[in-house]
């Protein structure tokens, strides 16, 4: 175990597998925001779940302090650390949680996603993934409190496990943003440069997005890592068959300044997800003043309340019609929609999120 200003005792101890610059998705963004506003009674363990890492760059963490790094093989050391509440973010951490570790201490499971198939199969929501189901159920049963990141995810969880209803709390994710947001006005000159940023996963709806612009005079710019090689191959085969090589462009994974430049180059950001438990990508687009064209499934509908350019991802031509509406609307209509996005963003500040979690800690400790 490698410690960076790690104290002898913490009231709250978060275990995570995404932190600093070691990010994959929304759970990592969440963790960095929790770290940004954490108090001195809160510690963090970055759990390395892959191969051993020989070197650790302290600059990967936003500040120096209250961080320990360990490999999953060392997780038994959690039993000897002094903490009151353990907070886990991922069902794979079920392997770390047992009586020896817990010792009658409190456990909170922050459910960033109920790990079902999409669409969810009736009678088999986990699609036969028994290992995933068992780990998820184990943590849910063991936890004193379950936190869902949207009302949609709460309802999804209760639909599968009604017995958990009384111990579920909802805390929407949050992000840190400038109070003054400048509208991206690329759409005044062009409404044909669209972008997608995120993982390559069938649930993200990338293929459906490409299919939707096939008959529209538009480009799609994709910023993504290579998470699923078979899905990428399927996408590439469609692009070739549809003769869209000059209109669909891959930029690789974009972070930092590259991400900023990528988002600023777009006329609108498309979020074609079949389902999103929350939807951090929407908040990021809103931070840059971008018009969004988004599915309305899951937490996205809560983020984009009252917004025009939303669609049902399972409706025929839903995304295509939303794109066409964006292209045909007046500049003043789009400005009005950007105003709605700016107002909605104010509901999701990370500092507010952090304060809501503090209320949960007090509830657990003081009853």
Kindly label every feature range from the protein language model.
Residues 88-93, 111:
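Short His-centered aromatic/hydrophobic patch
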Residues 26-33, 192, 199-215, 233:
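A conserved mid-protein helix/loop that constitutes part of the nucleotide-sugar donor-binding site
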